[in-house]
């Protein structure tokens, strides 16, 4: 998300925070951590160059540096990793800091579209010079862990560190995070697998959230689904949703979403759409609605519409 992993040598180790985002009672910083191998006087043994004259000049310069700074000891960087450092003025309980840490990982899970789980968590208490490790006891399904460990390609991410204002995004996210707990959980605990029951639940949840989004937009009751869809779904994503219902009836997309949601939620409704749709249809409809709700969030975080549409087109299943 931050930099292509295969090109990590392009980055210098920084002793200063790489970025800082700050609110009224919190501060979030991204910091480097690196490990080094001692190389000492053997540095010249691991350096090579096709230009022999340049290589010889390097050797001579290195010897001159050694003479000028006899106490200098060289080392080679082995690894470079990134950590978030979180501070809060008002939070005094460990659980509150853990919750804020999960908010950070939750946002990253949404932006990357895969579970992002805290690997290490340390606390530094006021007045202490030492860090204290925190052992997390949260349980995850093996499928979730496998997805979290799955490699991603920085260059193929439609939203990454370099093409958004990450400070602004974090500042807005900490204001909004509590309102999107149910959405965040679907990303953090994603398994990549759906039962029929889970597919039904996704449709009910995200259709209901579209209703709430419609209210924030000032939409009427008759447009409680179609108004958010028209606002946040790309033309391609909307077309994908429409394809499920065109083969069944001539009703509008909004009317069909309303009918399907009610058929799933109410036992007394006639199950016309439910009888016509397959489990694969249910899964995709639920995921498309989830992406539209996510796009509403991304828009509120200040991310440009063109990047949101690229995000939709990449994460939406065919």
Residue ranges and their predicted role:
Residues 1-104, 311:
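Long, contiguous, compositionally biased segments that the model treats as domain-scale units
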Residues 3, 16, 69, 114-117, ...:
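Intrinsic-disorder/low-complexity coil detector
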Residues 6, 12, 21-23, 53, ...:
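A generic structural signal for short, non-catalytic loop/turn and secondary-structure boundary residues
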Residues 13, 17, 22-26, 116-134, ...:
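Short, charged N-terminal helix-start/capping segments
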Residues 14, 24, 44, 61, ...:
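Generic serine detector
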Residues 75-147:
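Basic/polar, acidic-poor N-terminal "presequence/leader" segments
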Residues 133-318:
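Amphipathic, oligomerization/interface secondary-structure segments
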């Amino acid at each position: 998300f931050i930099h292509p992993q295969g090109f990590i040598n392009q980055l210098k180790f920084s002793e200063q925070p790489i970025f800082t985002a700050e609110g009224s009672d919190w501060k979030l910083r991204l910091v480097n951590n690196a490990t080094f191998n001692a190389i000492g006087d053997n540095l010249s043994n691991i350096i090579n160059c096709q230009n022999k004259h340049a290589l010889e000049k390097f050797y001579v310069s290195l010897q001159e540096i050694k003479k000028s700074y006899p106490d200098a000891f060289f080392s080679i960087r082995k690894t470079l990793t990134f950590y978030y450092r979180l501070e809060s003025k008002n939070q005094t309980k460990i659980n509150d800091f853990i919750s804020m840490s999960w908010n950070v990982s939750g946002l990253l899970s949404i932006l990357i579209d895969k579970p992002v789980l805290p690997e290490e968590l340390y606390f530094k208490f006021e007045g202490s010079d030492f860090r204290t490790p925190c052992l997390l006891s949260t349980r995850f399904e093996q499928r979730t862990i496998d997805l979290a460990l799955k490699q991603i390609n920085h260059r193929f991410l439609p939203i990454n560190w370099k093409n958004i204002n990450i400070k602004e995004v974090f500042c807005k996210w900490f204001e909004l995070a509590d309102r999107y707990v149910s959405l965040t959980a679907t990303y953090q605990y994603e398994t990549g697998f759906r039962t029929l029951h889970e597919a039904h639940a996704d449709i009910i949840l995200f259709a209901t959230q579209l209703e709430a989004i419609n209210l924030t937009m000032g939409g009427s009751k008759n447009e409680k689904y179609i108004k958010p869809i028209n606002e946040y779904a790309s033309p391609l994503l909307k077309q994908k949703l429409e394809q499920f219902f065109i083969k069944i009836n001539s009703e509008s997309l909004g009317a069909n979403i309303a009918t399907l949601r009610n058929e799933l939620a109410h036992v007394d409704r006639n199950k016309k759409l439910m009888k016509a749709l397959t489990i694969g249809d249910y899964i995709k409809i639920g995921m498309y609605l989830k992406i539209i709700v996510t796009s509403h969030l991304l828009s509120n975080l200040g991310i440009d519409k063109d990047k949101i549409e690229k995000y939709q087109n990449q994460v939406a299943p065919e």
